[in-house]
Amino acid sequence: MTFDVKACGARIRELRMKNGLTQETLAEDLNITDVHLRRIESGVRGGSIELLIELADYFHVSLDYLILGRGGRTDEAKEELNRIREQVEHIMRLL
């Protein structure tokens, strides 16, 4: 398994767009230039590990998802766990 800078950039772009953010807004929130963000999203360059951690936190995704495309959104996982927990509690009450 290798790091694909273009795929990572595409995931960042997708997350930004899903959240209705412009490159300028996201860049400002991350305290980087929009040119730097554009280069990351296009796969011209990779982000630093510190920036990737900040992006993962910002978008509530795992670093594993952001870098390698594995896993998913952490908030979706939490929602699924809560649904399962509620189902188990309901079953326990029925017993």
Residue ranges of each PLM-predicted region?
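Residue-level detection of the helix-turn-helix DNA-binding "recognition helix"
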Residues: M17, N31, S42-V44, G71
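A short, Lys/Arg-rich alpha-helix, primarily the initiator
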Residues: M1-K18
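DNA major-groove recognition helix of helix-turn-helix/homeodomain DNA-binding modules
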Residues: N31, E50-Y65
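Short alpha-helical DNA-recognition segment
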Residues: G20-R39
